[in-house]
Amino acid sequence: MLPLKQSEEALKDKRRLRWACRRGMLELDVLFEPFVDQAYDELSEEQKAVFRRLITCDDPDLFAWFMGHQKCEDEELAEMIRFMLSRVKV
């Protein structure tokens, strides 16, 4: 169990992350928010870094990648997208 201070920091970080996941497109919100709630804590630190990088991408790119309209050329991001799609049921 995390000491109280670390636990509070982790909760604060998760709130910041949830806020950062808010998108301008509902189609993306229904992917990102449940993923953060259901699966983010299970990721390795490396995977968390990839996820944080993913949420800095532009909404049109994210939408095209998640909907399969375009291929994400960054293999780490593409793997995270596949993982997210396998975990979040919409």
UniProtKB/Swiss-Prot annotation:
Pfam families: Sdh5. GO terms for cellular component: cytoplasm. Its main location: cytoplasm. It is found in: Cytoplasm. GO terms for biological process: succinate metabolic process. Gene3D superfamilies: Flavinator of succinate dehydrogenase (1.10.150.250). Keywords: Chaperone, Cytoplasm. Belongs to the SdhE FAD assembly factor family. PANTHER family: FAD ASSEMBLY FACTOR SDHE. An FAD assembly protein, which accelerates covalent attachment of the cofactor into other proteins. Plays an essential role in the assembly of succinate dehydrogenase (SDH, respiratory complex II), an enzyme complex that is a component of both the tricarboxylic acid cycle and the electron transport chain, and which couples the oxidation of succinate to fumarate with the reduction of ubiquinone (coenzyme Q) to ubiquinol. Required for flavinylation (covalent attachment of FAD) of the flavoprotein subunit SdhA of SDH and other flavinylated proteins as well. This is FAD assembly factor SdhE. It comes from Idiomarina loihiensis (strain ATCC BAA-735 / DSM 15497 / L2-TR).
